[in-house]
């Protein structure tokens, strides 16, 4: 086994080196400034009055020259006559007796300087050690990759559910690592790199560890941000060291998590003409990938949720040969993931796997794992013997709407305002044909700043939405504000988030989807943000659009929002009596589930298809 230099050999070697330098320096200094003479010569110097400050020891006598003597400042002689001290007054020289130190005190005096330097060095190294992830100052260029030998990852493909397509793609990598010759008999070579792309929480890192667990090979895991440091050249050195370690342990897997921290396209975020440390590290990674020999048995796996910002040179064939999408699971995938995580908790007989999978549309693997754990915590708080379906329902509400604020009670006026606002959303959603189911309406404060909420969950996985469906969603978003204006005559600040979401959706319809009849099927937005990140972003108008076109776009957005607001107002006005009756029930009970809400809104007048939208001139 190779012993790290700075861990076992560095400090003893450094100590001996400093001690040797100190002793050598002391010896050279003594040779330059001290003159050793016989006792007779020393006594002659005394007679001539050339000495002062005589120090008489047990075996040695020393003194300082009154003036420099051939560059020497001190003279030393071996004491021959013990009675020499008695004749000092005869020569008119002051003297004093000294006790000569033993070898231990001399050694300690010699080592004082080196020990101080060593202590300072050790202190600074520990500071850097903590900041640089454990490598220390002497090992700052070493890779910080965590190594999981053979099957010690503890993860197999059976532990990863809901991503069957991704597992099928990665199974080939496992087969190549297990038996390269059998799978290369037709001339096929093992891919050099596999890029796992997908939203956060979908199991990319877990998949990479499962590949290593299935193949039974060493697994080198490191984050892309761990390559970049404050010292120039450290990142490139760590890339080289990582690949050298992997080649020495081949067959092996290198896994770089959050590759976008390292592989961002060159030129992004740097000064014009600049060449920062990150780009130098990326260049070294490209060189290592080019130098990969497939027969060595080293595979590079990487994960990112920002593939659109990666350098094109990194994604070309011959580097990352295969790109695998790890997306959010569908209903059957969610069922499989829930089955894996639910096996770790005690479930009640009313547990319904299919029902929980149906109401968790859009949940990623990490979200489902958190849901099962949250449901178990809910059951634990009420001291139950098993986790029930109701516990899962409460857990979903906590995840989606936030934690209930038991001490954030509203006054009667605010409670009435919030009740009408939330029912404005709920009734418009019930009246429109293509909106998501309303599962619950509550005026109990939840989360950060939410005084109430209307919980809607889709009943099935949807990948496309028609124009009429988007207009219905706009109508539901503005239903709360429309209810406030209808009942109280003016809006409140509670609709701020609804307005922001509705405006973003309307701009998407006009700028990205070409859903305005006047502007036609033209995309006016710049390239959108990554669809894998999952963060809503307001679309930005392309610089190619003229000022006149920008005015028409603003008018189209205003027309969409105005039409949705008018439509919501008409729905609520047509069902005003039902709105008042349901609001009274909501204020009394504070929460209405789907069954109670449907009972209170029986006979609700449904809205028809949206009429043609006219832009404001």
Curated annotation (Swiss-Prot):
Membrane topology summary: Multi-pass membrane protein
Naturally occurring in which organism (per UniProt): Methylibium petroleiphilum (strain ATCC BAA-1232 / LMG 22953 / PM1)
Record Pfam families: AAA, AAA_lid_3, FtsH_ext, Peptidase_M41
Xref: PANTHER family: ATP-DEPENDENT ZINC METALLOPROTEASE YME1L1 (PTHR23076:SF97), METALLOPROTEASE M41 FTSH (PTHR23076)
Main location: membrane
EC number(s) given by UniProt: 3.4.24.-
Transmembrane domains' residue ranges: 8-28, 103-123
Main enzyme class: hydrolase
Record GO biological process: protein catabolic process; proteolysis
Function: Acts as a processive, ATP-dependent zinc metallopeptidase for both cytoplasmic and membrane proteins. Plays a role in the quality control of integral membrane proteins.
Protein name (database record): ATP-dependent zinc metalloprotease FtsH
Database matches in InterPro entries: AAA+_ATPase (IPR003593), AAA_lid_3 (IPR041569), ATPase_AAA_core (IPR003959), ATPase_AAA_CS (IPR003960), FtsH (IPR005936), P-loop_NTPase (IPR027417), Pept_M41_FtsH_extracell (IPR011546), Peptidase_M41 (IPR000642)
């Amino acid at each position: 086994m190779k012993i790290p230099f700075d861990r076992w050999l560095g400090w003893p070697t450094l100590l001996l080196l400093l001690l040797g330098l100190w002793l050598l320096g002391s010896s050279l200094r003594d040779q330059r400034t001290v003159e050793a003479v016989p006792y007779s010569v020393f006594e002659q110097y005394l007679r001539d009055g050339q000495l002062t400050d005589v120090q008489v020891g047990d075996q040695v006598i020393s003194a300082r020259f009154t003036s420099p003597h051939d560059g020497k400042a001190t003279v030393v002689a071996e004491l021959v006559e013990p009675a020499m001290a008695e004749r000092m007054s005869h020569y008119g020289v002051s003297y004093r007796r000294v006790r000569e130190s033993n070898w231990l005190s001399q050694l300690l005096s010699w080592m004082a300087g080196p020990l101080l330097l060593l202590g300072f060095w050790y202190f600074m190294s520990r500071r850097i050690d903590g900041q640089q992830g454990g490598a220390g100052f002497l090992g700052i260029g070493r890779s910080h990759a965590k190594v999981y030998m053979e099957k010690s990852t503890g993860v197999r493909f059976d532990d990863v559910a809901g991503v069957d397509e991704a597992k099928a793609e990665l199974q080939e990598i496992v087969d190549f690592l297990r038996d390269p010759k059998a799978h290369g008999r037709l001339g096929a070579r093992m891919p050099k790199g596999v890029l796992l792309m997908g939203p956060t929480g979908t199991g990319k890192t877990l998949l990479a560890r499962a590949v290593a667990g299935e193949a039974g090979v060493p697994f080198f895991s490191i984050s892309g941000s761990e390559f970049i440091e404050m010292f120039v050249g450290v990142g490139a050195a760590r890339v080289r060291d990582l690949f050298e370690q992997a080649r020495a342990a081949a067959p092996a897997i290198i896994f770089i998590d959050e590759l976008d921290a390292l592989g961002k396209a060159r030129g992004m975020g740097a000064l014009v003409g600049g060449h920062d440390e990150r780009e130098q590290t990326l260049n070294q990674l490209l060189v290592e990938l080019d130098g990969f020999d497939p027969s060595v048995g080293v595979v590079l796996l990487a994960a990112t949720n920002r593939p659109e910002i990666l350098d094109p040179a990194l994604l070309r064939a011959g580097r990352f040969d295969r790109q695998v999408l790890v997306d959010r699971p569908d209903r059957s995938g969610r069922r499989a993931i829930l089955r894996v995580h639910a096996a770790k908790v005690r479930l009640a007989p009313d547990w319904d796997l299919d029902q929980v999978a149906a109401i968790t549309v859009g949940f990623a693997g990490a979200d489902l794992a958190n849901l099962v754990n949250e449901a178990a915590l809910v059951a634990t708080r009420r001291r139950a013997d098993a986790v029930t379906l109701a516990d899962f329902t409460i857990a979903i509400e906590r995840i989606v709407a936030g934690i209930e604020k038991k001490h954030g009670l509203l006054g009667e006026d605010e409670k009435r305002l919030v009740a009408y606002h939330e029912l404005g959303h709920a009734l418009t959603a019930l009246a429109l044909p293509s909106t998501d189911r309303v599962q619950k309406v509550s005026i109990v404060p939840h989360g950060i700043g939410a005084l109430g909420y209307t919980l809607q969950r889709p009943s099935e996985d949807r990948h496309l939405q028609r124009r009429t469906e988007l207009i219905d969603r706009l109508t539901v978003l503005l239903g709360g504000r429309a209810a406030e204006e209808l009942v109280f005559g003016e809006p409140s600040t509670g609709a701020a988030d609804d307005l922001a979401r509705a405006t973003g959706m309307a701009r998407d319809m006009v700028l990205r989807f070409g859903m305005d009849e006047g502007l036609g099927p033209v995309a006016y937005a710049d390239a959108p943000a990554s669809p894998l990140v999952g963060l809503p972003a307001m679309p930005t108008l392309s610089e190619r659009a003229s000022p006149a076109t920008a005015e028409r776009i603003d008018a189209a957005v205003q027309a969409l929002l105005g039409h949705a607001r008018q439509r919501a107002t008409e729905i609520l006005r047509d069902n005003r009596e039902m709105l008042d009756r349901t609001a009274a029930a909501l204020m009394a009970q504070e929460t209405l589930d789907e069954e109670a809400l449907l009972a209170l809104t029986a006979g609700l007048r449904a809205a028809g298809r949206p009429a043609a939208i006219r832009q404001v001139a």
